[in-house]
Amino acid sequence: MRDPAPSNSEMKRVIVGMSGGVDSSVSAVLLMEQGYQVEGLFMKNWEEDDGTEYCTAREDLADAQAVCDRIGIKLHTANFAAEYWDNVFEHFLEEYKAGRTPNPDILCNREIKFKAFLDYALMLGADLIATGHYVRRRDIDGRTELLKGLDPNKDQSYFLHAVGGEQIARTLFPVGELEKPQVRAIAEKHGLATAKKKDSTGICFIGERRFTDFLRQYLPAQPGDIKTTEGEVIGRHSGLMYHTIGQRQGLGIGGLKDASDDPWYVLVKDLDNNELIVGQGNDHPWLFSRALVSSEIYWVNPIDLSSPRKLTAKVRYRQSDQPCTLEKTAGGYRATFDDPQRAVTPGQSVVFYDGEICLGGGVIEIAEPWTSKDKR
């Protein structure tokens, strides 16, 4: 099922969000082949204040311009750095300050790519926008559904779950029907400068810097004790914000007397006492949760939760779908899983699915332990 093509009687104008990567480049090519009137837009969402382009913005803009020149379309540029700071980055810092582990890409999609960019494109006279995300859309019964991308290794519906159906209805996702090797082959065939460009990874505004070094620029470190589940102090941490549930690397502990050689993992971030609770073993019981709570769910389209509903969910990107029961509670929503879930992390997102349909999701606020609380 392809994204809808324009009728012969109506040439629709589409503005593609050109990131300087291969996916958006090929999206523009495919839309041109489908008969759309295509233009590109490069958005800059971060202002470097130290003279170094950590987000490779200059290089990405040059690549986007080279692709647009090659295929003969106009490239607009827009600076959404102020919107990004106000609506994404400040929230990112607040979450870390509160001891949670946020995902800024999800907020960026909701507030920037499918809000600021969409509004700007409509102001330029576009009928639709397009992005290089690996997702699909389907119009059915007067609503627009968000579907998983066909390539399970690249499906990005997890990151778009907070975008509403009205915004999805105004967006085309040309590469959502394809697998990554096909996308690169199309780019090669058309001689695009981005054909062999590596996929971007990590958070754009951090770039190649160490994450801890970046955070220290904005949040003061608050050192505290690292303790075992029995309460023994075995080390010091530089700040809870630098650690996440299930983390193994970078704890600075090991070789302890009377301890086994099993690796140590972060089990709990005790905010009240500024303590990091750790335990040994990848399958430590404290790492597993049976349920989670979220106070607010962003639905692509509203769903009926008048009674508990069997769905599947992901608590992290690229996780396989996990069967669960979702119910509305007085304080929000509770998802109970059929199987124990490892390293459910407050601040991250839980995303719900009904088969290939991405229904929506919310921020995890509480992870309920698989073992009884009195054992913890």
From Swiss-Prot:
The active site is at 108 (nucleophile), 204 (cysteine persulfide intermediate). The keyword tRNA-binding applies. It is an enzyme of class 2 (transferase). GO terms for molecular function: ATP binding; tRNA binding; tRNA-uridine 2-sulfurtransferase activity. The record marks 133, 348 as: Interaction with tRNA. ATP binds at residues 17-24, 43, 132. Residues 154-156, 316-317 are annotated as: Interaction with tRNA. The keyword Cytoplasm applies. Disulfide bonds join 108-204. GO terms for biological process: tRNA wobble position uridine thiolation. It holds the Pfam family tRNA_Me_trans_M. GO terms for cellular component: cytoplasm. Keywords: ATP-binding, Cytoplasm, Disulfide bond, Nucleotide-binding, RNA-binding, Transferase, tRNA processing, tRNA-binding. Residues 103-105 are annotated as: Interaction with target base in tRNA. Its EC number is 2.8.1.13. Catalyzes the 2-thiolation of uridine at the wobble position (U34) of tRNA, leading to the formation of s(2)U34. NCBIfam families: PRK00143.1 (NF001138), trmU (TIGR00420). HAMAP family: tRNA_thiouridyl_MnmA. Belongs to the MnmA/TRMU family. This is tRNA-specific 2-thiouridylase MnmA. It comes from Pseudomonas syringae pv. tomato (strain ATCC BAA-871 / DC3000). The lineage of its organism: Bacteria, Pseudomonadati, Pseudomonadota, Gammaproteobacteria, Pseudomonadales.
